[in-house]
A protein has these predicted regions:
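Beta-sheet-dominated scaffold domains
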Residues: 2-147
Length: 147
């Protein structure tokens, strides 16, 4: 998957096929074909999200990828289910307010022991918050900031 800074064209997140390509039908559905090229066609996701200028917010574990979209003030998870705003689970206003006002880095990390995605906002609120898949929410706010 490729993350772009801002929405470009129809989508800002794209899947790039490897060793295959896609042929599109008139209805927009794709047929995947074999190809000798290492990288195939970029297929856009139907979303309005991008990683803004904060690639350091990206973290992944197993089949899930997490990142922030500062421009839209959201935290996102990309998985087999598609793109989802995990910031909507109890922290929508917090991220709308604090991501947009963040002037520096937005650090993302994944804690494999606790199975949590951590987001650190050092300049706007000087703390970290963690998203947990097991409760589908944000169980903790931490006083440390990831470096």
């Amino acid at each position: 998957m490729v993350k772009q800074a801002l929405k470009i064209g129809r989508a800002s997140c794209r899947e790039i096929l490897t060793n295959k390509d896609a042929l599109f039908n008139a209805d927009g559905s794709a047929n995947v074909t074999s190809n000798n090229a290492v990288l195939g066609q970029a297929i856009p996701y139907n979303s309005n999200y991008g990683i803004s200028t904060n690639p350091e917010s990206f973290a992944d574990f197993t089949y899930r990828a997490y990142f922030t979209d500062k421009k839209n003030g959201v935290v996102l998870r990309h998985s087999a289910d598609g793109m989802e705003e995990v910031s909507n689970y109890g922290m929508k206003d917090y991220f709308k307010d604090n991501l947009r006002s963040q002037t520096g880095y937005i650090y993302g990390s994944y804690d494999e022991k606790k199975n949590q995605y951590n987001v650190s906002l050092p300049t706007s609120v000087n703390n970290s918050v963690s998203y947990s898949e097991s409760i589908n929410g944000w169980p903790s706010r931490k006083s440390f900031v990831t470096e």
